[in-house]
Curated annotation (Swiss-Prot):
UniProt gene name: AGTRAP
DNA-binding listed as a keyword: no
InterPro entries on file: AGTRAP
UniProt name for this protein: Type-1 angiotensin II receptor-associated protein
Coiled-coil portions: none
UniProt KW keywords: Cytoplasmic vesicle, Endoplasmic reticulum, Golgi apparatus, Membrane, Phosphoprotein, Transmembrane, Transmembrane helix
Record's subcellular location: Endoplasmic reticulum membrane; Golgi apparatus membrane; Cytoplasmic vesicle membrane
């Protein structure tokens, strides 16, 4: 199934809006973490061909999924919530729920920009071509293992 084309600017605008509303209740480290990642997203928009920018934004989104879970679970106000507080918490949770979908779209953009597959299954798949390397069980042994390289005399030591 092919993912629909979603503009990176739409993802940034949506998460910026939800993060701003989430900061009504969760300020401090929640705001720093999310707005820093959104700044990486602005960098990814500014440099359309940069694999580094989009990969940093993708990694940051993945990290903020974990960080948002921690922030919401630790700093959730348990005593009394006003309607504004409930709205802010709801927007922070909605932002958290939309981040995995955003990660899928951003990963698709990463692949379009020329990024490689992040998940390597080398031990399950076929082995890499190592024809340029000499095997350990090679029958070719050096003629004289203590031979002096050309252009160096016996008294020139490397230590």
């Amino acid at each position: 199934m092919e993912l629909p084309a979603v503009n990176l600017k739409v993802i940034l605008l949506g998460h910026w809006l939800l993060t701003t509303w989430g900061c009504i209740v969760f300020s401090g480290s929640y705001a720093w973490a999310n707005f820093t990642i959104l700044a990486l997203g602005v960098w990814a928009v500014a440099q359309r061909d940069s694999i580094d920018a989009i990969s940093m934004f993708l990694g940051g989104l993945l990290a903020t999924i974990f960080l948002d879970i921690v922030h919401i679970s630790i700093f959730y106000p348990r005593v009394s919530l006003t309607d504004t507080g409930r709205f802010g918490v709801g927007m922070a949770i909605l932002s958290l729920l939309l981040k995995p979908l955003s990660c899928c779209f951003v990963y698709h953009m990463y692949r379009e920009r020329g990024g490689e597959l992040l998940v390597h299954t080398g031990f399950l798949g076929s082995s890499q071509d190592r024809s340029a390397y000499q095997t350990i069980d090679s029958a070719e042994a050096p003629a004289d293992p203590f031979a002096v390289p050309e252009g160096r005399s016996q008294d020139a030591r490397g230590y």
